[in-house]
Curated annotation (Swiss-Prot):
One record GO biological process: negative regulation of translation
Gene that this polypeptide is encoded by: rplM
Lineage of the organism: Bacteria, Pseudomonadati, Campylobacterota, Epsilonproteobacteria, Nautiliales
Chain's role: This protein is one of the early assembly proteins of the 50S ribosomal subunit, although it is not seen to bind rRNA by itself. It is important during the early stages of 50S assembly.
Keywords in alphabetical order: Ribonucleoprotein, Ribosomal protein
Name of this protein: Large ribosomal subunit protein uL13
Length: 140
């Protein structure tokens, strides 16, 4: 009988992947980022092991939206006090803090567990073209 060996956390080889978000559709980029963070693009993907790569997103403020989602979609947060449900539109988040917008959207596509929080820490988002990870990102 043959057995499939699943990979261990210490055997995973992690790469740094650079994604330029300039003039690309927001939802398609987020889907690609979530797939890379989970490690589903690798042949040795194992659901219970974090085998994803690091992702660096540049030009996050120049992303496009396919429809009028900028004005319609909202992100909600609650402070814990009565009547303090805060809402922000996607357009406001994109103008003020595009890094937060990318992290919130990606978090919705990752598992809601300790493993998902660990995966989200490997996402680095920058509004401009400059980023401090040029030494890690190779060849992209």
């Amino acid at each position: 009988m043959k057995f499939t060996k699943s990979i261990r956390e210490e055997d995973v080889k992690r790469d740094w992947i650079l994604i330029d978000a300039k003039d690309k559709v927001f939802g398609r980029i987020i889907t690609e980022i979530a797939t890379i963070l989970r490690g589903k693009h690798k042949p040795y993907y194992t659901p219970h092991v974090d085998c994803g790569d690091y992702v660096v997103v540049i030009n996050a403020d120049k992303v496009k939206f396919s429809t009028s989602k900028k004005l319609e979609d909202k992100y909600y947060k609650h402070t814990g006090y009565f009547g303090n449900l805060k809402e922000e539109t996607v357009e406001k988040l994109l103008n003020n803090n595009p890094e937060k917008l990318f992290k919130l959207a990606t978090r919705g596509m990752l598992p809601k567990t300790k493993l998902g929080r660990k995966m989200l820490k490997k996402l680095k988002v920058y509004a401009g073209e400059n980023h401090p990870h040029t030494a890690q990102v190779k060849g992209n």
